[in-house]
């Protein structure tokens, strides 16, 4: 569990790693929108990356949680096309074909500002791909414990 308030540590990610059918389905819907240069925001332990790795030519991973960032660097250390950033998305003018927020936006308190920043970082006709937990009325202690600010 998350022992310290406001410090996300990703303890629940190992459970979501096992959702292979869901991840395969999700990737079948979004792969055609990825393009050659993508950014994934909050990739956690890299589960999603494993499903789309072969598609783009260049991948930038923005993981602000130090422990998860270090694990990502170790897991994909031999990759020539993955760049790692231990921070939130930096505004990069028209740099990406797509930006992924897969089960991440709910962790960002100022989500609207984040979406604007991401949009400004997309190339013309780029894709902003977002997956979030639905049904705000289901917001629970679990959401709080895993660092969710809200459901949508």
Q: Where do the model's predicted regions map?
A:
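Conserved N-terminal segment of class I S-adenosyl-L-methionine
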Residues: 1-102, 112-115
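Short, glycine-/aromatic-enriched active-site segment of Class I SAM-dependent methyltransferases
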Residues: 129-152
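A short glycine-rich, Lys/Arg-flanked "PGG" loop and its adjoining helix->strand segment in the class I
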Residues: 112-127
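Feature marks short, surface-exposed loop/turn motifs that line or immediately flank catalytic pockets
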Residues: 47, 68, 108, 125, ...
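A short His-aromatic
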Residues: 103-107
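A short hydrophobic/small-residue beta-strand
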Residues: 59, 128-129
């Amino acid at each position: 569990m998350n022992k310290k308030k406001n410090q996300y540590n990703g303890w629940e990610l190992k459970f979501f790693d096992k959702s292979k059918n869901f991840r395969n389905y999700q990737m079948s819907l979004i792969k055609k929108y990825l393009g050659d240069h993508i950014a994934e925001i909050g990739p956690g332990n890299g589960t999603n990356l494993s499903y789309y790795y072969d598609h783009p030519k260049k991948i930038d991973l923005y993981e602000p949680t130090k422990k998860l960032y270090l694990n990502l660097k170790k897991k994909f250390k031999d990759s020539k096309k993955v760049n790692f950033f231990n921070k939130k998305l930096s505004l990069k003018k028209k740099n990406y074909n797509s930006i992924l927020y897969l089960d991440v936006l709910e962790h960002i308190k100022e989500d609207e500002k984040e979406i604007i920043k991401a949009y400004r970082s997309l190339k013309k006709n780029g894709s902003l791909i977002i997956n979030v937990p639905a049904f705000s009325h289901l917001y629970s202690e679990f959401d709080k414990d895993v660092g969710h600010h809200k459901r949508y």
